[in-house]
Curated annotation (Swiss-Prot):
One Pfam family it belongs to: Cpn10
Gene3D superfamilies (alphabetical): GroES chaperonin (2.30.33.40)
Cellular compartments annotated: Cytoplasm
Top-level taxonomic group: Bacteria
Organism of derivation: Thermosynechococcus vestitus (strain NIES-2133 / IAM M-273 / BP-1)
GO BP terms: chaperone cofactor-dependent protein refolding
Known role: Together with the chaperonin GroEL, plays an essential role in assisting protein folding. The GroEL-GroES system forms a nano-cage that allows encapsulation of the non-native substrate proteins and provides a physical environment optimized to promote and accelerate protein folding. GroES binds to the apical surface of the GroEL ring, thereby capping the opening of the GroEL channel.
Subunit note: Heptamer of 7 subunits arranged in a ring. Interacts with the chaperonin GroEL.
Record key words, sorted: Chaperone, Cytoplasm
Protein's UniProt name: Co-chaperonin GroES
Length: 103
């Protein structure tokens, strides 16, 4: 089996899937207390790095995607598949898991 080199630029989502770079989690509380890695909340915000072509409708046409590369999005807390590439955290989501475009 040949080795596959994965990088952000080689990830091309299929259908209505979206590849999102996860935002950094807060390291300190509002009161200034430093949080260890295992006590931090899982972020639900990230930047879209790749977008699939859209879902096929029953008549064979592609439904356009509501998000584009560069959008900052809010997504469901337990949605998607987590991926780590080059030391960065990403999540692969379905479009239905995106709750809002922010900023």
């Amino acid at each position: 089996m040949a080795a596959v080199s994965l990088s952000v630029s080689t990830v091309k989502p299929l259908g209505d899937r979206i590849f999102v770079k996860v935002a950094e989690s807060e390291e300190r509380t509002a009161g200034g207390i430093l949080l260890p890695d295992n006590a931090r909340e899982k972020p639900q915000v990230g930047e879209v790095t790749a977008v699939g072509p859209g879902k096929l409708t029953e008549d064979g046409k592609r439904q356009p995607m509501d998000v584009k590369v560069g959008d900052k999005v809010l997504y469901s807390k337990y949605a998607g598949t987590e991926v780590k590439l080059a030391g960065e955290d990403y999540v692969l989501l379905s479009e239905k898991d995106i709750l809002a475009i922010v900023g």
